Design a protein with these regions (language model features):
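Stable alpha-helical elements in mature extracytoplasmic
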Residues: 51, 58, 73-76, 108-112
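A short beta-strand-turn-helix
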Residues: 25-41
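Thiol/selenol-based redox catalytic cores and closely related redox-interacting motifs
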Residues: 83, 89-164
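N-terminal signal peptide c-region/cleavage motif recognized by signal peptidases
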Residues: 15-17
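Sec-dependent signal peptide recognition
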Residues: 2-9
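Conserved helix-turn-beta segment immediately C-terminal to the redox Cys motif
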Residues: 59-79
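Local sequence-structure signature of Cys/Sec-based thiol-disulfide redox active-site neighborhoods
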Residues: 37-59
């Protein structure tokens, strides 16, 4: 019976890496740090498809302002969105999590800082779609679009959190 605690400890030590958000577990296919991440900064877990370059650019913008961004390449990004209650009308190409909130799409660092400063009673923020000019979607070939950052409450109701 003395070896049971060691078995429990051993099973904990060899368990696969799992991230839990909103009570859901997500096992990434690959997990790496975005280069330049501040290991002492607030951690953002970014989930994206392997082929999405603008998602990685968004992560780099978050690193630029001091966040520690964990890049999770996922094979089930749509399943993740469904399990987190992110409707298709709010969806974008990537989903991130910070301090218990979801951050869907190309949400600017300024809005994330406001979210973490105010800590509202919401599920998360969303920038639906992929607006040109939003973080990770910058281009010199097209004018930036105006867009809203939406606050999403736990019932799925939305309100404007910020406008750009």
């Amino acid at each position: 019976m003395k070896f049971i605690p060691f078995l429990l400890l051993g099973s904990i030590l060899v368990a696969p890496s799992v991230h839990s958000h909103g009570g859901h577990d997500h096992r990434p296919a690959e997990e790496t740090m975005i280069p330049g991440s501040n290991k002492n900064g607030i951690e953002i877990n970014l989930y994206r498809d392997k082929s999405c370059g603008c998602c990685k650019k968004w992560g780099a913008r978050m690193v630029d302002v001091g966040y520690n961004v964990v890049d999770n390449v996922s094979n089930d990004i749509n399943d993740l969105k469904i399990s987190e209650g992110i409707s298709s009308s709010l969806a974008s190409c990537h989903t991130a999590f910070v301090e218990g909130y979801f951050v869907e799409g190309h949400v600017p660092a300024k809005s994330i800082a406001k979210l973490l400063r105010e800590m509202p009673n919401i599920a998360g923020l969303s920038v639906p779609g992929m607006p040109i000019g939003s973080p990770g979607m910058e281009t010199s070939q097209m004018a930036a679009e105006s867009y809203d950052v939406l606050a999403v409450d736990f019932d799925g109701k939305v309100s404007v959190f910020d406008s750009y």
